[in-house]
């Protein structure tokens, strides 16, 4: 039936109005998509398995000019691939070419005259990466057409130029799982005839849609964090080739046209003038091609390259020319636009194909200039690191594992990082070797390092001034994404900018994890302690899963001359089997956790190990509220952090099914961001209250915290602008005496607090509270939106985390002046005891993009430690 259905839809697709490449002859020995998949490039949305099968068929048909590389595998088991296309001579010695490309990328190792030889002989490498959002469908169709054209075209001088002067890397789909979801949903929603109505089922994706991957991540925000396997595989492949041009092909609203750079303001501070000049060269070439074919387009609007986690900006921070291409999306085979025109899937394929081929031709034409720009970028980066700060020192005494993970993540982006092997002297301090990492600044990735580690990346001043004017007039700002992302700030790792080399003995990190070596544990008379932190939390989650009994310290104590903080894990021999040392050693090694054997439990100061303040932990039974009305990203981030980051088993239950759940089967219920008023009525709210009183732990975040406060589950209120409580009536407007303050007179009487566009705000924590276990009392909190909550009163709960005062509030990014007084000293983490249980509320999403490691630790503290309290 499905095959017959597909045939019907193919027949109904309007015939293409233009050939992909008019007048081009193609080699019949190279298969078309129709021969492999049964449809043309522009006639049908090709499923991911058929995309891979077709590229494999192309590589097999032209083995002298193409090689299909498997770069990784998605969470759902689908392969991610990259097709490499070049001349027969170059492909025959591909490994040697790649080695030379990597040599060009590191000017420090080049001998006299070698740079000129490399520039003279090396190809320009252009990477075309497609479909990072699975429902942006035409780009993958274009990817297959691009590959076919480059391998099958005969007598085409432009293709000859491309093969002679360049290597082309084609990643056909960065998000196969999302594409598969879209194809299934779109096919299921189709009628007998194609339906162009925007409201038709085939255009209306059910939650969560195809944009996101299995864990509901936006993979176009993951380039530097690399939390997802799709990203890690792609980045590793690109670092193997060090491409000089990287184009990320997307889709946008069906009522738009086509976007290619030059980009909108603001640009990233670390982009060079020559990179911008070359971006203009590519823009002009695309404009000429589009004008020739009568295609509408725009640029210098909407899409900027400020945030370094995009497919356009991460490559630019490495020295490449990066670009985002956006095509209006039919979100199916045909869409009726608001102007009355019909947009087809085939139109999108044609437009992307045209831009992509124009790009590789332009790169080939300007090969030498592009290679020199790339080399100059990398060489000047090294020189920049020879003045100013010579080394960036990353350290965390309270959580060495946090610093280690940060260092490992930097290495994934090709950044050189060294692990300290001895104490490090810097700035009059001596740092322990454990948890200390050194980033030399005189390396080719200097600009990327500054992008990722500096506390603040400045934004164009004129642009910011215009946004202030817009905000004053109650117009939305034009900031496309967050304004801060400093990894040390979000990971609770101290950054020290050393003005001279520390001289400490170090070990260079590579792409393997540098774990603490606890391959064996000696027998201990009493048991073992595990100082709390990210490594310990992951180790305890596995230990509980494996049936090891663990207790948790509810207060500080001193034992054996060492101080231990709240949350320290206590694993007693008497609670466990005789093979505890072996089992615990294996678990600790996997996670890098420190384990301290103890032969007596006589505490000299602080809480005794047998105190009533020691709680017994059990593996928590966690329910994650799934589906609408949860915000897609928030649901996915929470599930990823639980299941993959910390190894916590989780049951995802759709919000619409909560009424059928026996809450007593669960210890923890997590409500991701969202307004649950429609899904959780009065009856379910009463059940949640009773469940908490019986010992359950409920966790809310961002918009679900606003919902919990509004319905009375949480004893605080969301504020309106100026501090008025949500729900209070504004005062009646009065006519002011003249003269008046015009802006004040026209301000609305009731509005949300000023929006914060993704800034990092200083958060202060009560380190005596178990929710703050593993922290040093101060972290960076990613604040995005208009949420401000009043502090909970002491008789109802504890404000475990609050924002700093106005003068110390902003760590990085933009917080508008009007927002600072209202944010300052307000809570971002509230603990409200409810009978024998808890309601734990975060003002923001602690799992933001899974790269806010410091607040993620607070979240997992709530999950692991809450049920035992």
Segments predicted by a language model, with ranges:
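Aromatic- and acidic-residue-enriched carbohydrate-binding clefts of CAZyme catalytic domains
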Residues: 198-217, 728
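Short, solvent-exposed turn/loop segments enriched in Gly/Ser/Thr/Pro and often Arg
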Residues: 172-177, 186, 249-256, 704
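Active-site cavity-forming subdomains of large catalytic enzyme subunits
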Residues: 185-203, 224, 231, 243, ...
């Amino acid at each position: 039936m499905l095959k017959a259905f597909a045939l019907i839809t193919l027949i109904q697709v309007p015939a293409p109005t233009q050939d992909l490449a008019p007048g081009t002859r193609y080699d019949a020995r190279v298969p078309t998509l129709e021969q492999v998949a049964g449809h043309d490039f522009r006639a049908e949305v090709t499923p991911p398995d058929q995309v891979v099968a077709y590229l494999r068929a192309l590589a097999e048909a032209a083995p002298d000019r193409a090689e299909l590389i498997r770069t990784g595998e998605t969470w759902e088991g689908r392969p991610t691939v990259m097709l490499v296309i070049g001349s027969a001579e170059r492909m025959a010695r591909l490994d040697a070419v790649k080695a030379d490309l990597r040599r060009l990328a590191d000017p420090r190792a080049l001998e006299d005259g070698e740079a000129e030889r490399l520039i003279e002989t090396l190809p320009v490498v252009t990477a075309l990466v497609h479909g990072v959002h699975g429902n942006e469908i035409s780009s993958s169709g274009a990817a297959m057409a691009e590959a076919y054209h480059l391998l099958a075209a005969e007598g085409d001088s432009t293709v000859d130029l491309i093969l002679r002067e360049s290597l082309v890397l084609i990643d056909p789909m960065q998000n196969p799982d999302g594409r598969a979801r879209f194809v299934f949903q779109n096919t299921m929603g189709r009628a007998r005839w194609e339906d162009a109505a925007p409201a038709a089922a085939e255009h209306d994706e059910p939650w969560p849609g195809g944009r996101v991957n299995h864990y509901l991540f936006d993979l176009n925000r993951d380039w530097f964090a690399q939390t997802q396997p799709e990203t890690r595989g792609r980045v590793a492949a690109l670092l193997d080739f060090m491409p000089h041009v990287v184009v990320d092909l997307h889709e946008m609203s069906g009522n738009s046209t086509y976007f290619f750079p030059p980009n909108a303001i603001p640009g990233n501070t670390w982009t060079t003038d020559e990179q911008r000049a070359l971006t203009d060269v590519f823009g002009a070439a695309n404009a000429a091609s589009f004008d020739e074919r009568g295609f509408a387009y725009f640029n210098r609007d909407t899409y900027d390259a400020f945030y370094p986690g995009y497919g356009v900006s991460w490559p630019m921070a490495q020295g490449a020319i990066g670009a985002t291409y956006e095509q209006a999306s039919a979100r199916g085979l045909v869409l009726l636009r608001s102007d009355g025109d019909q947009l087809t899937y085939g139109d999108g394929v044609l437009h992307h194909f045209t831009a992509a081929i124009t790009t590789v031709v332009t790169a080939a034409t300007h090969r030498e200039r592009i290679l020199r720009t790339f080399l100059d970028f990398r060489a000047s980066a090294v020189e920049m690191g020879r003045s100013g700060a010579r080394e960036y020192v990353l350290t965390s005494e309270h959580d060495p594992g946090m610093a280690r993970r940060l260092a490992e993540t930097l290495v994934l982006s090709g950044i050189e990082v060294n692990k300290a092997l001895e104490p490090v002297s810097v700035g009059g301090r001596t740092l322990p070797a454990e948890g200390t990492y050194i980033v030399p600044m005189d390396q080719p990735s200097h600009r990327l390092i500054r992008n990722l580690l500096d506390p603040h990346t400045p934004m164009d001043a004129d642009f910011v001034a215009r946004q202030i004017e817009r905000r004053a007039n109650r117009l939305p700002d034009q900031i496309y994404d967050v304004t801060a992302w400093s990894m040390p700030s979000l990971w609770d790792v101290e950054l020290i900018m050393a003005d001279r080399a520390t001289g400490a003995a170090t070990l260079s990190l590579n792409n393997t994890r540098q774990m603490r070596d606890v391959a064996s544990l000696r027998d201990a008379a009493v048991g073992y302690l595990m100082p709390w932190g990210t490594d310990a939390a992951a180790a305890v989650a596995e230990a509980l899963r494996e049936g090891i009994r663990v207790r948790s310290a509810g207060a500080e104590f001193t034992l054996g001359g060492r101080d231990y903080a709240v949350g320290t894990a206590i694993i007693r021999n008497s609670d466990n089997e005789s093979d505890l040392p072996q089992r615990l050693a294996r678990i600790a090694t996997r996670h890098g956790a420190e384990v301290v054997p103890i032969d007596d439990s006589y505490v000299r100061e602080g809480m005794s190990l047998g105190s009533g303040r020691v709680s017994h932990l059990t593996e928590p039974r966690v329910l994650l509220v799934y589906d609408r009305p949860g915000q897609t990203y928030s649901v996915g981030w929470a599930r990823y952090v639980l299941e993959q980051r910390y190894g916590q088993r989780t049951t995802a239950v759709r919000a619409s099914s909560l009424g059928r759940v026996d809450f007593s089967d669960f210890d923890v219920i997590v409500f991701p961001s969202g307004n649950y008023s429609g899904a959780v009525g009065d009856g379910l709210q009463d059940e949640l209250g009773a469940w908490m009183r019986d010992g359950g732990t409920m966790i809310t975040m961002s918009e679900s915290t606003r919902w919990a406060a509004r319905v009375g589950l949480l004893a605080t209120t969301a504020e309106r602008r100026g501090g008025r409580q949500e729900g209070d009536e504004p005062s009646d407007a009065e006519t002011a005496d003249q003269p008046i303050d015009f802006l004040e007179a026209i301000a609305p009487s009731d509005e949300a607090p000023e929006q914060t566009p993704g800034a990092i705000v200083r958060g202060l924590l009560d380190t005596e509270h178990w929710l703050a276990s593993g922290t040093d009392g101060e972290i960076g909190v990613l604040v995005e939106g208009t949420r401000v909550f009043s502090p909970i009163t002491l008789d109802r709960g504890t404000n475990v985390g609050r924002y700093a005062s106005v003068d110390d509030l902003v760590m990085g990014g933009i917080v508008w002046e009007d927002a600072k007084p209202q944010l300052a000293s307000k809570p971002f983490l509230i603990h409200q005891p409810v009978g024998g249980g808890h309601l734990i509320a975060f003002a923001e999403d602690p799992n933001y993009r899974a790269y806010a490691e410091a607040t993620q630790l607070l979240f997992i503290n709530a999950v692991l430690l809450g049920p035992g309290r």
